[in-house]
Structure formats: structure tokens, C-alpha cells
Design a protein with these regions (language model features):
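C-terminal, active-site-flanking charged/polar segments
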Residues: 302, 306-316, 320-348
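Long, acidic/serine-threonine-rich intrinsically disordered regions with weak helical/coil propensity
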Residues: 127, 132-140, 144-256
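Single conserved hydrophobic/aromatic residue that forms the stacking wall/gate
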Residues: 2-15
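Amphipathic alpha-helical segments within extended alpha-helical solenoids and repeat-rich scaffolds
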Residues: 1, 16-29, 57-77, 104-128, ...
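Polybasic, low-complexity terminal segments and linkers that are predominantly intrinsically disordered
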Residues: 479-482, 490-505
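Hydrophobic residues within the alpha-helices of tandem HEAT/HEAT-like
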Residues: 44-48, 87-95, 141-153, 189-200, ...
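Extended alpha-helical scaffolding segments
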Residues: 249-252, 272, 276-287, 292-310, ...
Length: 505
């Protein structure tokens, strides 16, 4: 075994040395083939860069730096840019590059920004009309800025350069014009501003007035977009969520609260985005296009749940994501579980049981609307109800309930849901599917006391009678209602002297 391991090590060393020699040749050979070049750049993170130092071949290391930077500046293929930026980040942090990193990054900064500055030279960015070539140049430049900021702390690109910062703000503000051809570079500008603030905050010093000023400028613009709309609303929402999450959790002198009005707009925009994606997701099936949709959903949902978890968004806004439980991929459902945990923590530990119950009702209403629309989502409605039940209790061994949500809040939730059913019946147009709501509600009976169950049952009878709604025995459409009623009476029966006061319909 020791001989085999020694041979494997020797083989690995030979491979590394061969790679040092072969990679520059391959990069030169395929310099015009962006997809192939992107594959080659993906090799760099798996290289042991110390080999250059160990073999005293720093000339080859410097040459690799030049090659990667050259390809980063020559191409605009998104995957190639991402992999080139990752390679630059690794080369910049290699120990043997310490004496050249600063100068090389400064040169790269100048190269990245020169095309941007040339395009914007002596122009009023907020009012000028960009040609097709201008749009292409801006998109390429901002894509490089964004990709670098995503891969490493490249905030020096915008530090101490107020004119450039103002240009970036102005380019992002062009989202208000809603020109289709400018959509991509507006997205890059907004995302770059957000990433800059993330990196700048990470290394912030006390009383960083420039950071506070720039943060406020970006948030003011984002809030304006949330109010008035733009053609990059998904990007606006994502930036709003990550910035408010960041600045809700930092030290006190930088901390800001997300206004309730902005929270509501974020929740509304998030729900609108998911509502738009549901039919697209259903149509794509298992196609390749589904992967991009999955990534987009995950990006927005993860930012949204993070904002809920830290408290930047109030628990009442969890309904916006929970409504769509079961309608997307499994990662989305796991993020819904995170939202349910936030609700449970609030219900049990923050005396916010009423808000949690209101959120449960809103989530059920949203899921019912999807059921009315598509007719095949009943299992998703029921699965959602099972998850929401976890927000109302803390379980112990053997599924025992160790702690439960406030009883009065739960009674109000059940009564309000019954009233929602009555409203569905009054509105009509649901083809007799209204009672499916009880198929979800039955899963929220677990924490009720006998007296609470009896109170809900009595109130339900009164509400139905007042609305002249009479459940029909033998009609399968009413089965969920009778199952719910039976469950209430079974809970009430746990207190023997209450049993005789209620009879099934």
C-alpha cells in the first residue's frame, strides 16, 4: 500500500507539472471559443498554485495571470466571466502573488472601467439616448464589475471615486425608463451596487459616513422602484431583501429597520413573482429550461427567508412564500420549512400568536386560490396545512405536545377560516370545491382543548345557518366538512360533560 501511495503521489506531481505547461497552450489554442475556454478556466480552482513557487517558475505564474485577465476582458460569455473572476480571486490570494497582487488588480480595475468611462464621457446618463453599441459596451463593462464583486472583494473599483459611483447610480436609475434593451445592464448595475455595499460593510470602520451615505442612496432608489415599478423588479426585490437583511443585523451605528410599507411591498412583489412563475414551472416539466427557473426561485426565496429569519421582515409576511408550498422544487419547500420555524418561534416565544394565526389563514387562502385555479393541487394544500400545524406547537417524545400556541388565537383562526369558507360559497364560481378548505383545516385541530373545539363547532353552526348554507349528507363534495366536524366533536368528547351539548349535523 505504501508503494502504491508513493506512486500515486508521484503521478499527481507529474500531472501538476504537465498542467502548468499545458494550460497556457490550451488557453491560447481555444482563445476564440468561449464555451471551451470557460471549461479550461474551471481547471484553475483545482490546481495547486504552489507548484509555480516550488518549481521556481514564477514567469509561468505571471503569464497565467496575464492570460486569465486578458480573457476576462476579451469575452462577455457569463459562465466564462464567472470562472475567470474565480480564477483571478485564487491567483490574487496565492501566497507567492503577494508582491504583485495590488498592482495587477489596479491594472485590471483600470481596464474594466475604461470602456465604461469612455462610453459615459461627458454624457448626462439619466437623460441621454444610448445607441445599440453603447448598450453593448455598458452591458459588457457592468457584467465584469458585477462578476468581480461576486467573486471577491473588488469594492476598490468604486471606493474613492465619487463620479464613477454617481454614474453607477444613474445607470441603475435608468430602470425607471423601462427600455427593454437596457434591462440587462440595469440588472448588473443594481446588483453591483448591492455587492459593493456588502463588501464595504464587511470592512467598515467606526463612523463610516461615506458608507452610510451610499447605503441610503441605494436604498432610496430601491424603495422608489418598489413603489413605482420597473422592468427589473425581480432584481429590485432581491437587492432590497439582501440589503435590509444585512443592515438589520449589523452594529447599531449602521443598523436600520425596514419600514412596514417597504416590507409589504417586498411581500407583494415576491408573491407576484412566484405567481408569475407557477404556470411557467408547470409548463416546463423536466426540461433544461427548468434549471434556470429553479435557480431564480431559489435566489429570491433564500433571500426572502433570510429576511424573515433575522426579523427584517415581520412574521406576517411569511404567507407570501408559504402559499406556494409544494408548487416548486424541493429546495423551495425546505425554505418554507424555515419560514414555519420562524412562525413557531414567534408564536411560542415572542407573544405573537395572533400574528402567526393570521399568517396561517393568509397562507391557506392563497393556497386555496391556486387550487381553484388549477384543480389538481389539493395534495399541496393538505401538505401546507400539515406544515402550518408545526407552527402551532412544540412536540416532545411520542408526538406529545410540550407547548402550544395561545388557545384564543387558535379559536379565532378556526372561526375566521370557517367564515372564509362561507365567503367562498357566497362568491360562487368554485364548482363546489369550497369545502376542500376543511381538508386543510382539520390538520390544525391538534392543539385545541375540548371547550375550544365545542366553541368552534357552535360558532360554525351559527355562521352556516346565518348564511343559509346547509351541508349535504351523502354529497362527496361535503366530505371534508363532515370530517372536520367529526374531529371537533372527538376533541370535545375528551371532556365527558361537554359531549352531550353538541351533536353532529
Amino acid at each position: 500500500p505504501s508503494v502504491r501511495r508513493r506512486r500515486e503521489r508521484q503521478s499527481c506531481i507529474r500531472d501538476r507539472l504537465c498542467l502548468v505547461e499545458a494550460l497556457p497552450l490550451l488557453l491560447a489554442k481555444y482563445s476564440a471559443d468561449a464555451p471551451r475556454l470557460a471549461d479550461l478556466l474551471a481547471v484553475v480552482p483545482h490546481m495547486r498554485l504552489e507548484v509555480y513557487h516550488e518549481t521556481r517558475n514564477m514567469e509561468a505564474f505571471e503569464s497565467l495571470w496575464d492570460d486569465v485577465c486578458a480573457h476576462f476582458m476579451r469575452h462577455v460569455h457569463p459562465v466564462l466571466l464567472q470562472r475567470a473572476a474565480r480564477a483571478i480571486q485564487l491567483l490574487a490570494t496565492a501566497p507567492m502573488a503577494a508582491h504583485t497582487t495590488t498592482s495587477r488588480l489596479a491594472t485590471l480595475k483600470e481596464s474594466v472601467l475604461s470602456l465604461l468611462q469612455d462610453t459615459l464621457y461627458q454624457r448626462q446618463v439619466d437623460t441621454t439616448v444610448f445607441s445599440e453599441d453603447d448598450v453593448h459596451n455598458l452591458q459588457a463593462s457592468l457584467a465584469r464589475v458585477y462578476t468581480l464583486l461576486k467573486a471577491m472583494d473588488a469594492s476598490a473599483l468604486l471606493d474613492d471615486d465619487e463620479p464613477l459611483w454617481q454614474h453607477m447610480l444613474a445607470l441603475a436609475m435608468r430602470g425607471r425608463l423601462q427600455y427593454d434593451q437596457e434591462k440587462t445592464f440595469v440588472h448588473y448595475a443594481l446588483s453591483s451596487l448591492a455587492l459593493y455595499l456588502l463588501w464595504r460593510t464587511k470592512r467598515a470602520i467606526d463612523d463610516d459616513t461615506e458608507l452610510v451615505s451610499r447605503r441610503d442612496e441605494v436604498l432610496q432608489m430601491i424603495h422608489m422602484f418598489l413603489e413605482r415599478g420597473s422592468h427589473v423588479q425581480a432584481t429590485v426585490l432581491h437587492v432590497a431583501l439582501i440589503l435590509h437583511t444585512l443592515f438589520f443585523t449589523v452594529r447599531d451605528d449602521l443598523r436600520i429597520l425596514c419600514p412596514e410599507e417597504i416590507q409589504t411591498r417586498c411581500a407583494t412583489q415576491f408573491s407576484t413573482e412566484l405567481q408569475t412563475l407557477v404556470p411557467l414551472y408547470r409548463a416546463q416539466g423536466k426540461s433544461i429550461a427548468l434549471l434556470d427557473t429553479d435557480m431564480h426561485i431559489s435566489m429570491l426565496a433564500s433571500a426572502y427567508v433570510a429576511a424573515l429569519r433575522v426579523g427584517a421582515l415581520g412574521v406576517q409576511h411569511a404567507a407570501a412564500i408559504l402559499t406556494y408550498y409544494g408548487h416548486f422544487h424541493s429546495d423551495f419547500d425546505r425554505m418554507c420549512h424555515e419560514a414555519v420555524e420562524v412562525m413557531r418561534d414567534d408564536a411560542m416565544h415572542s407573544d405573537r400568536a395572533w400574528a402567526v394565526c393570521e399568517t396561517i389563514l393568509e397562507a391557506l387562502k392563497g393556497s386555496m386560490q391556486l387550487y381553484f385555479q388549477y384543480k389538481d393541487t389539493e395534495p399541496r394544500l393538505v401538505s401546507l396545512a400539515r406544515q402550518l400545524a408545526n407552527a402551532t406547537m412544540i412536540r416532545g417524545p411520542g408526538f406529545s405536545v410540550v407547548r402550544a400556541i395561545d388557545a384564543n388565537a387558535m379559536v379565532t383562526l378556526h372561526v375566521a377560516t370557517v367564515q372564509q369558507f362561507v365567503q367562498y360559497v357566497r362568491d360562487g364560481g368554485h364548482e363546489g370545491h369550497e369545502a376542500k378548505l376543511f381538508k386543510a383545516l382539520v390538520h390544525l385541530v391538534g392543539t385545541l382543548h375540548p371547550s375550544d373545539a365545542l366553541k368552534i363547532h357552535a360558532t360554525m353552526q351559527q355562521r352556516l345557518a346565518a348564511a343559509h348554507v346547509e351541508p349535504e349528507q351523502g354529497n362527496k363534495a361535503w366530505d371534508p366538512y363532515f370530517a372536520y366536524e367529526k374531529r371537533l366533536l372527538n376533541v370535545a368528547a375528551k371532556d365527558a360533560h361537554l359531549l352531550h351539548t353538541a351533536q353532529p349535523t
